[in-house]
Amino acid sequence: MKFSALLPVFFLLLAVIDYCQAFAFLAAIPSILSALGKRDVKTQKYVDIKRRDLDLDDMLSKLFED
């Protein structure tokens, strides 16, 4: 597919996105999607604890291997 064939699709997509910005719930979709991928303080705390527990379990298993 040629790049020149995709150009009208790109402009149509821009027009649709611009039109959707008028609706509050559609305008919130990009921010919601970006927030899904971010770590917040609450979840990061549990990730760190889990990682420390795995490191501790690994260390204890190496100590008691003998």
Swiss-Prot record:
Residues making up the signal peptide according to the UniProt record: 1-22
Propeptide residues, chain positions: 37-66
Tissue specificity note: Expressed by the venom gland.
Gene Ontology CC entries for this record: extracellular region
Compartments in which it is found: Secreted
Annotated positions of the Leucine amide modification: L36
Keyword Metal-binding: no
Keywords carried by this UniProt record: Amidation, Antimicrobial, Cleavage on pair of basic residues, Secreted, Signal
Source organism superkingdom: Eukaryota
Primary site of residence: secreted
Entry similarity comment: Belongs to the non-disulfide-bridged peptide (NDBP) superfamily. Short antimicrobial peptide (group 4) family.
Function: Probable antimicrobial peptide. Has no inhibitory activity against herpes simplex virus type 1 (HSV-1).
Name of protein: Antimicrobial peptide Eval967
